[in-house]
Amino acid sequence: MTDRCLASINAALTDSDPAIAGLIDQERQRQETHLELIASENFTSQAVMQAQGSVLTNKYAEGLPHKRYYGGCEHVDAIEELAIERARRLFGAAWANVQPHSGAQANFAVFLALLQPGDTIMGMDLSHGGHLTHGSPVNVSGKWFKVVHYGVEPDSQQLDMEAVRQLALKERPQLIICGYSAYPRTIDFAAFRSIADEVGAYLLADMAHIAGLVAAGVHPSPIAHCDVVTTTTHKTLRGPRGGLILCRDADFGRKFDKAVFPGSQGGPLEHVIAAKAVALGEALQPEFHAYSCQVVANAQVLAGRIQERGIAVVSGGTDNHLVLLDLRSIGMTGKVADLLVSDVNITANKNTVPFDPESPFVTSGLRLGTAALTTRGFDEEAFREVADVIADRLLKPQDESIKAQCLERVRQLCGRFPLYRGSL
């Protein structure tokens, strides 16, 4: 029995579970042969994946470093402390908690620490670029709290901060949320701070989409202006899938330690925390600044070329990694566009646009992001080609010869910019 147990834990995945091994290999091939334009996705380094797939997955470590409920935590303590130190240094924060399993968990911990059921929260409408956890009725944030939503202006499709201020003065929320999932413009955190102070509200920045750009100094930082900041550690930060909470005030930050554990989670995922530490270390390197600048430059080229081809872009452009196509300009739905680009090995997602007449299951938009392909080495010239492939496919959806040409151009682009060199 002992020999059989040892054999099972030392067997390679291809031997112990060929079905899963085969599916993982198929996914690896898909990533290598498709153009990944989902704005919330990126490609981590092999070092990040090695940390996440390590023996740390075996270790339980409830509590904080040096305050655990389990023994044998001396090494995971050191790893978690390193992740915390790197997060604080990268973002200029006084306090950090690296344990949240996701961005949604990080947001929930903030609500648990600062609010009572029935309190009023104010965030951007989901259809205008907000997030489910910012008060959507299908999310716990929309069930536990009174929710007031702000949105963009119809003409500019950008935020009008005076309109946000007037809404806050009227509703007097306990918490204001800024930071979005489909807003392509720079966020004025200082203006939000002024509004929050005027109405006596806490200010939460959910910078999940722009964290990498903030870390690199390519987008203004919310740290100095907000009471608390949450983020994911993937997307533009290019780490593992997970969450992070940051504060400018260490004493205030300790509220969230208790809200994470034992308030909303049990044992932290120390293998993921190790991977977060690796990614945060990578983001502290000069190369990450160059990468983030390229992400924005590529997005602006993508938005510009798409518009040149006659397809409207929400707000007329972008300041970050996001480009949101308004397909009403060509009489197409997001659902159809998503299927069309998928047929030529381009991965994106249908998305609502401001004042969308379609349902969230159909939508009038297609959301694109440049972070993942920039990781592969795509530059402005390559993204101009990507824009043309997308436009050709959407503008002539019935033309099979155009479809075949698009598939070949995608194949050539993937060949020019290989993903992972060496075996995984």
Curated annotation (Swiss-Prot):
Residues modified to N6-(pyridoxal phosphate)lysine: K235
Matches recorded under Pfam families: SHMT
CDD domains: SHMT (cd00378)
Positions marked as site (Plays an important role in substrate specificity): H234
Pathway(s) it belongs to: One-carbon metabolism; tetrahydrofolate interconversion; Amino-acid biosynthesis; glycine biosynthesis; glycine from L-serine: step 1/1
GO biological process: glycine biosynthetic process from serine; tetrahydrofolate interconversion
InterPro entries: PyrdxlP-dep_Trfase (IPR015424), PyrdxlP-dep_Trfase_major (IPR015421), PyrdxlP-dep_Trfase_small (IPR015422), Ser_HO-MeTrfase (IPR001085), Ser_HO-MeTrfase-like (IPR049943), Ser_HO-MeTrfase_PLP_BS (IPR019798), SHMT-like_dom (IPR039429)
Protein name: Serine hydroxymethyltransferase
Source organism of the structure: Prochlorococcus marinus (strain MIT 9303)
